[in-house]
């Protein structure tokens, strides 16, 4: 039986707090993903010759993509620790920890010497800092997602939950604008010599802004209630896998295809356009920028519409579009025409939005309050490994071994079909669950 909330606030005050929460989750995730995307775009454009040069052009690019993917391997560890802390001590403390961790790692990458300066220590240090980024990212999203959704009115969970989601395309837009500006006003030699470091170092400024906003956000109502009832899980991870393993697996599979397709937009398309199609770097960055805007718009729409037609149906529409578009888009990309190249990416984001915007709300509704942070974070982290971790690397290997670009589309379509099946296994009735109170019946009732 659900217990009445002991932390209800007057409507006006709660509205003010909701606005503060939305700003905190949006700004924080935008900064986190700006840091992440700066690395992804650097991996596409400059890290191969600067840190992996002895491996040859193709080998260096593969190593660069591998350095992007390797951080995903520690995401589950970050998710486990963040989930434990978040379920026992609150969502807010995790949001601050992950923000600082990601920012510090990003700034230090901007200070790293290259292979030409310190030899093999350069890629070793790069990978260590990349692991630090991944560890922080493993806990960031779950905290932001839950803070937004657990503060939301029942009929607006999808909309509220879309705010941390649009931090992803917003971070991408910021990173792309930075890279575009540097690429436009610097020669290739200047960019390779020192220009690529600037966006990494700039993250220090963004972290200060994000910390200032997040420190004033109040803890979520349901966690406050659990504290009052002494209902926090003493061992959230054990409780999670004893009774909710199915939900964790479904959460991972639901996210896998969106993450894989998203990382093509984030990183691979820029490299593919410049290295394989001979497009100018500024052209591929323009395409990525416009794609980021499309991703933002359709993600917000996906969260909003999921409150009207349901989470599951919204996901099904998004993944259906990705399945149908994954192969044909390569015939537009391969024209090397900027307009068609950009159009291919924008159409892909029409599928990415509905399969990403409602994710915060869907995940929160899948898990009971006392293990919600652990379940959401670990499901997300595992989905990142299955989907996005090595998507650019797999895409490059498929291209090198088959010689046809649409083979990458087959890979994405198969993943999207798996995610479509997984989300179809989630009961539509979970959308009726009350996330503002600690519900003991929900705690004992898996999907």
Description of each model-found segment:
Residues 40-41, 245-294, 388-391:
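Extracytoplasmic gate region of multi-pass secondary transporters
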Residues 43-77:
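Extracellular/periplasmic helix-loop-helix junction of adjacent transmembrane segments
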Residues 79-91, 299-311:
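Helix-to-loop junctions at the C-terminal end of transmembrane segments
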Residues 88-100, 308-319:
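Cytoplasmic membrane-interface "Motif A"-like loop-to-helix N-cap segments
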Residues 100-118, 320-335:
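C-terminal ends and interior cores of transmembrane alpha-helices
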Residues 159-183, 379-391:
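Glycine-rich segments within core transmembrane alpha-helices of 12-TM secondary carriers
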Residues 210-217, 413-440:
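Multi-pass alpha-helical transporter architecture, strongest
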Residues 312-358:
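C-terminal transmembrane helical hairpin of 12-TM major facilitator-type secondary transporters
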């Amino acid at each position: 039986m659900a217990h009445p909330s002991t932390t209800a606030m007057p409507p006006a005050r709660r509205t003010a707090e909701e606005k503060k929460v939305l700003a905190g989750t949006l700004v924080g995730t935008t900064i986190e993903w700006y840091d992440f995307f700066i690395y992804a775009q650097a991996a596409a454009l400059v890290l191969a010759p600067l840190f992996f040069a002895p491996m040859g052009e193709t080998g260096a690019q593969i190593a660069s993509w591998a350095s992007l993917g390797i951080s995903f391997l520690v995401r589950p560890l970050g998710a486990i620790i963040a989930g434990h802390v978040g379920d026992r001590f609150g969502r807010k403390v995790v949001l601050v920890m992950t923000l600082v961790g990601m920012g510090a790692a990003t700034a230090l990458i901007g200070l790293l010497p290259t292979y030409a300066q310190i030899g093999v220590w350069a890629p070793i240090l790069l990978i260590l800092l990349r692991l630090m980024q991944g560890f922080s990212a493993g806990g960031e999203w779950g905290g932001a997602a839950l803070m937004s959704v657990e503060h939301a009115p029942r009929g607006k969970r999808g909309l509220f939950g879309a705010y941390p989601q649009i931090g992803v395309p917003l971070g991408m837009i910021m990173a792309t604008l930075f890279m575009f500006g540097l690429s436009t006003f610097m020669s290739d030699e200047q960019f390779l010599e020192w220009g690529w470091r600037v966006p990494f170092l700039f993250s220090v400024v963004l972290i200060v802004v994000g910390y200032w906003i997040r420190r004033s956000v109040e803890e979520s109502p349901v966690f406050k209630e659990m504290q009052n009832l002494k209902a926090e899980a003493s061992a959230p991870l054990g409780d999670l896998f004893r009774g909710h393993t199915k939900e964790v697996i479904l959460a991972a599979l639901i996210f896998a295809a969106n993450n894989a397709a998203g990382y093509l937009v984030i990183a691979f398309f820029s490299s593919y356009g410049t290295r394989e199609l001979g497009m100018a770097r500024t052209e591929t960055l323009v395409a990525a920028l416009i794609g980021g805007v499309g991703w933002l718009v359709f993600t917000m729409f996906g969260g909003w519409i999921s409150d009207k037609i349901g989470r599951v149906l919204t996901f099904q529409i998004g993944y259906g579009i990705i399945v149908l578009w994954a192969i044909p888009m390569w015939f537009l990309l391969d024209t090397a025409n900027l307009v068609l190249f950009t159009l291919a990416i924008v159409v892909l984001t029409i599928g990415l939005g509905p399969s990403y915007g409602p994710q915060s709300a869907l995940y929160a509704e899948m898990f009971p309050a006392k293990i919600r942070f652990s379940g959401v974070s670990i499901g997300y982290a595992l989905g990142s490994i299955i989907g996005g971790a090595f998507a650019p690397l797999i895409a490059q290997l498929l291209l090198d071994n088959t010689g046809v670009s649409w083979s990458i589309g087959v890979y994405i379509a198969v993943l999207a079909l798996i995610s479509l099946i997984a989300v179809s296994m989630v009961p539509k009735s979970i959308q009726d669950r009350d996330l503002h109170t600690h519900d003991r019946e929900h705690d004992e009732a898996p999907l």
